[in-house]
UniProtKB/Swiss-Prot annotation:
InterPro entries registered for this protein in UniProt: GCL_type2/YbdK_subfam, GCS2, Gln_synth/guanido_kin_cat_dom, YbdK
Family to which the UniProt record says this protein belongs: Belongs to the glutamate--cysteine ligase type 2 family. YbdK subfamily.
Keyword Ligase carried by entry: yes
GO MF assignments: ATP binding; glutamate-cysteine ligase activity
Domain of life where this protein originates: Bacteria
Protein name, per record: Putative glutamate--cysteine ligase 2-2
Keyword Nucleotide-binding appears in the UniProt entry: yes
Organism for this UniProt entry: Frankia alni (strain DSM 45986 / CECT 9034 / ACN14a)
Entries under Gene3D superfamilies matching the protein: 3.30.590.20
Record EC number: 6.3.2.2
């Protein structure tokens, strides 16, 4: 939906549940959700919160060691930020009451053996996809941006694909895997690619072609249903939105807000190009995957792939060019100054991956990384 021409944006964040003393993951999702329901932190958007109305909801995910929050749709970044802060606070309170801590990291730094949530759909996923499902303790941040029609959605999807790797780099927050440095800034991206429907796509051209591809993936068993269409960007099967799914869950609320602002501007810019009849960029899925791999590997610390020019460029240069490209839409929503400040802050303090590695480097202890993540998850959400 839109309000006075401004597209709404909503954010889903997935979190790991950890023992704050032993620093290991805990299969506590059901206890956390039970406490959340008791305190008004679960259920549909708009549930009661001790400090006001909780602007969103909490839910279970594939594994018992994680929970997911979902904000209500907003037109203003301030409103969205307030929603995300409230949800993190509510989830952290519920987690603490259940004896665990909330951790905004896209992979758990310590060794883990996740367990599947006992729901028929998730148990079927385990049976159909084996180790891919059993090891899938990863946490993403998904952004829903309102669209006016399915035609506009596909037109925008086809045109925004070359810029998605920039969002991967900016949100990288998963350098550790099973207790060791993975060598990647976003190792979640690599783990996620195991799913047969995950990753970059070619251009679809029309809703009919999009539907044909989705139907074929389901009929061949690559996906059990629409919910397992794990494209980098997909048409939501619940809401009139495009859902951008490339990002790690962000360590801080500020980074989540920056992601949402850029995602909305990206969709709006691509939709404007579609409406104007501008051609779809001729970029092969293989090159989209290569750009995503490099963003996953280095974050914003090295060079990224400039798909338009076909060369490697410094990460900051490509980020600045991306922000300039979506600049008219940022100006239209009044977000230009806020985004500029958030980008500067991101490069000044580093991505979540940079901060996790810095915590480890001080003493060489993975427990310090977990402590940092727990602290940073709720620092911006403090009353």
């Amino acid at each position: 939906m839109t309000t006075e021409g401004v597209r709404t944006v909503g954010v889903e964040e997935e979190f790991v549940l950890v023992d704050p003393d032993r620093h290991a993951v805990r299969a506590a999702a059901s206890r956390v959700l039970a406490r959340g329901d008791r305190d008004g932190a679960g259920g549909p958007p708009g549930g009661a919160d001790p400090d006001g109305d909780l602007d969103g909801d909490l839910d279970v995910e594939l594994t018992r060691e994680q929970v997911e929050s979902g904000s209500a749709p907003h037109t203003s970044l301030a409103g969205l930020r307030g929603s995300l802060v409230g949800l993190r606070r509510a989830a952290a309170r519920a987690a603490e009451a259940a004896g665990v801590a909330l951790a905004a990291t896209a992979t758990c730094p310590t060794p883990t053996r996740p367990t599947i949530t006992p729901k028929p759909r998730y148990e079927r996923m385990r049976g159909e996809f084996g180790l891919t499902a059993r090891e899938q303790l990863t946490c993403g941040c998904h952004v829903h941006v309102a669209v006016h029609s399915r035609q506009e959605a596909v037109g925008a999807l086809d045109r925004l694909r070359p810029w998605l790797s920039v969002l991967v780099a900016m949100t990288a927050n998963s350098p550790f895997w099973q207790g060791a440095d993975s060598g990647y800034a976003s190792y979640r991206t690599q783990v996620w690619q195991r799913w047969p429907t995950a990753g970059a796509t070619g251009a679809f051209g029309s809703p009919a072609e999009y539907d044909r591809v989705v139907d074929l993936l389901i009929r061949t068993g690559a996906a059990m249903d629409d919910g397992m269409i794990y494209f980098d960007v997909r048409l939501s099967h619940h809401y009139p939105t495009l859902e951008l799914r490339v990002a790690d869950v962000c360590l801080s609320v500020d980074d989540s807000v920056l992601l949402a602002a850029l995602a909305r501007a990206l969709v709006a810019t691509a939709a404007r190009q579609w409406a104007a009849g501008e051609p779809v960029p001729t970029v092969r899925p293989e090159l989209l995957r290569a750009a995503g791999w490099r963003a996953s590997r280095h974050g914003v610390s090295g060079e990224l792939v400039d798909l338009e020019r076909g060369e490697l460029v410094p990460a900051r240069a490509l980020v600045d060019r991306f922000v300039e490209w979506v600049g008219p839409e940022l100006s239209a929503t009044g977000d230009g100054d806020a985004v500029a400040a958030l980008v500067d802050n991101l490069f000044a303090r580093g991505t979540g991956a940079d901060r996790q590695r810095a915590a480890y480097a001080r003493r060489g202890r993975i427990d310090d990384v977990v402590d940092l993540v727990i602290r940073e998850t709720t620092t911006m959400a403090s009353p």
